[in-house]
Structures are given as C-alpha cells and as structure tokens.
C-alpha cells in the first residue's frame, strides 16, 4: 500500500512526498519516484517537515500501536479495517490526538471508508429499508494467507465472489433475508507441494472455521506457473445497496446502488488515504484536533479545489 500512496501523491499537485519511513534498512528500499527513505526511528525528528503522516501498516499488529504513537507527533491517516475493533481503536487514538493537538483519521479506505459513507447516506435518506453489502469479485489477501498456512500448500489465491442470484433479488426489490452462504462464494486456486495429499488440503480448506466453513467453496489445484501467470494481480470491489420505501403507505420503492470495480485493491485504498490526508491537514489548520472517521469529515475537505470552484463546477 505504501507504493500506492507514493503513486497517488505523484498525481496530487497540492501535495509533496517528503519521505518514506521503514522499519527495514532504508538502504534496502527502492522507491518508485526516487523519494527519500528514512528509518522509523527518524520520524520524531522531522515534525517540522511533515504535515500529515500516512500509515500503511496492517490492522492486526501495526496500526493499534502505530496510529496512537504517531498521533502524538503528526496529523495521521490510517486504513484500520478490523470492523469490530474500530470503537476501541477510535478511543485510543482520540485521546492521543487531542492531547497533542493533532487530527487522526482512522479507517479510511473503501470498506471501511467509502462503503461506510454510502451505508450512512442510504439509511439517512431511506429510513424504511434494508442494507446489503457484497464484496468481490476480488482477491482476499487474508483468506489467501490462511490457505498458504495449511501444511502441504506452496502458494494460493482466494477470490470472494458475490452470488448473482442474490444480487438480482436485491435489485428486484424483494428485500431477501440472506445467509452468509447465500451472499458469497469462495473460489480457491492452490499450488500443492510435491507429494502433498490434495484431498487432505481441500478438506482443510472447505472446513476451516471463520474463513470457508460457512461458504460454498470451490478448490482448484494448479501449477505455480499458472498461478503466477493468471492470478498475479490484486483486484477487488463490491456493491453497497440500500433498498427502501417512501409515501404514507410505503407505496413507492427505491434502490441505491454504489459499485466499485478495482484493478488494484491497495492502490485504490491508497488513493482514498491521500484524499483524507488532505482533509486532515486542512481541518488541523482550522484548529480541530482528535480522532475522526469518514463520517465526521465534510466532503469539501477532500477535494483539492476551493469551495468557490466546487460550488461553481460540481454542485
């Protein structure tokens, strides 16, 4: 995702990449644009040079500590995506940011992030209705990693795919009650190590709790060459629906559909982070501090143009 942020900043004329901070040896990291590379230990020495720090670490082990620590020094943006733990992450980051007069935007990305906003708008506009969120078709990196941890597996990719019948039922306004299995299927492409028992691997995948057991799961065994050739990208996407009714007798039906089709999941997420970095800087310049989510940030803060231009051209 760091590479994605580097690319997104190159397309943002009002922003400048001061440097990339790494826990590795800075000399070992080659950037795409020739940006300077610093050790993470240097971060606290550069507070006068940097307006916003964009955090590209993982939600499981990096961001719970990193966002809190960095918000003591900088305005920050992260893409924390463990939905169930967002309230506790918010509370910890809010304390740190407020105590140090900084803005910290958490959980920016597309889900949480852009999808969250569309769920909120849908519920606000159509209070009598139902939400539906579908993910894919796309590579789930967490599920792919789970397969790779199975004994006998050399490499793997897992795709999350919406069930077409479920999508069409929602679009027809049938307001279906959908189980996990009825919403998505999982398709796995697996490279088995030489001599590994494929039946044992397949059984371990399809019965894996929290990952595959609740889904209809298909497993394909292919060669490493085929995997590298046909499944090297990280596409993703999804759809947020809000169905609802209006009128005294709920006689009129409505459907809101917001869809993403992404060639590169990390690059799109990075582009969202950069837009919210702009907002964090602007809000802090106005004297605001504390933790913010996409729900708390006015859209005009995200766009490089002024309010006058936005009102004249987009409104």
At which residue positions do the language-model features occur?
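Rossmann-fold NAD(P)-binding glycine/threonine-rich loop
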Residues: 80-106
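NAD(P)-dependent Rossmann-like dehydrogenase/reductase catalytic/cofactor-binding core
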Residues: 250, 254-315
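Gly/Ser/Thr-rich loops at beta-strand to alpha-helix junctions
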Residues: 1, 60, 83-86, 107-116, ...
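Oxidoreductase and adenylate-handling cofactor-binding alpha/beta cores
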Residues: 114-130, 145-155, 279
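General beta-strand structural signal in soluble alpha/beta enzymes
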Residues: 78-79, 104-108, 134, 157-158
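Short alpha-helices
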Residues: 98-123, 273
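Rossmann-fold NAD(P) dinucleotide-binding segment
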Residues: 43-52, 60-79
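C-terminal substrate-binding/catalytic lobe of Rossmann-fold NAD(P)-dependent oxidoreductases
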Residues: 3-4, 11-43, 139-277
């Amino acid at each position: 995702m760091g590479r994605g942020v580097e690319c997104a900043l190159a397309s943002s004329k009002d922003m400048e990449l001061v440097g990339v901070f790494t826990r590795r040896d800075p000399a070992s990291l080659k950037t795409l644009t020739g940006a300077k590379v610093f050790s993470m230990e240097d971060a606290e020495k550069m507070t006068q040079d940097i307006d916003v720090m964009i955090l590209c670490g993982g939600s499981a082990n990096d961001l719970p500590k990193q966002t809190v620590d960095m918000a003591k020094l900088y305005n920050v943006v992260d893409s924390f995506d463990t939905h169930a733990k967002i309230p506790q992450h918010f509370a910890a980051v809010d304390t740190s940011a407020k105590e140090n007069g900084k803005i910290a935007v958490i959980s920016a990305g597309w889900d949480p992030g852009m999808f969250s906003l569309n769920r909120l708008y849908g519920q606000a506009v159509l209070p009598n209705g139902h939400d539906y969120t579908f993910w894919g078709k796309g590579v789930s990196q967490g599920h792919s990693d789970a397969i790779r941890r199975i004994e006998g597996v050399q490499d793997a990719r897992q795709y999350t795919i919406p069930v077409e019948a479920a999508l069409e039922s929602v679009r027809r306004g049938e307001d279906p009650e959908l189980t996990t299995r009825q919403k998505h299927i999982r398709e796995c492409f697996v490279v088995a190590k030489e001599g590994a028992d494929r039946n044992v691997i397949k059984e371990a995948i399809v019965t894996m709790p929290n990952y595959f057991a609740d889904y209809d799961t298909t497993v394909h065994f292919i060669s490493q060459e085929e995997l590298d050739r046909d499944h090297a990208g990280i596409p993703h996407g999804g759809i947020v629906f809000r169905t609802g009714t209006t009128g005294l007798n709920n006689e009129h039906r409505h459907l809101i559909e917001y869809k993403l089709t992404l060639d590169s999941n990390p690059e799109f997420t990075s582009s969202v982070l950069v837009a919210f970095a702009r907002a964090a800087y602007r809000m802090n310049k106005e004297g605001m501090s504390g933790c913010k989510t996409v729900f708390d940030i006015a859209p005009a803060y995200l766009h490089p143009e002024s309010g006058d231009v936005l009102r004249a051209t987009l409104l």
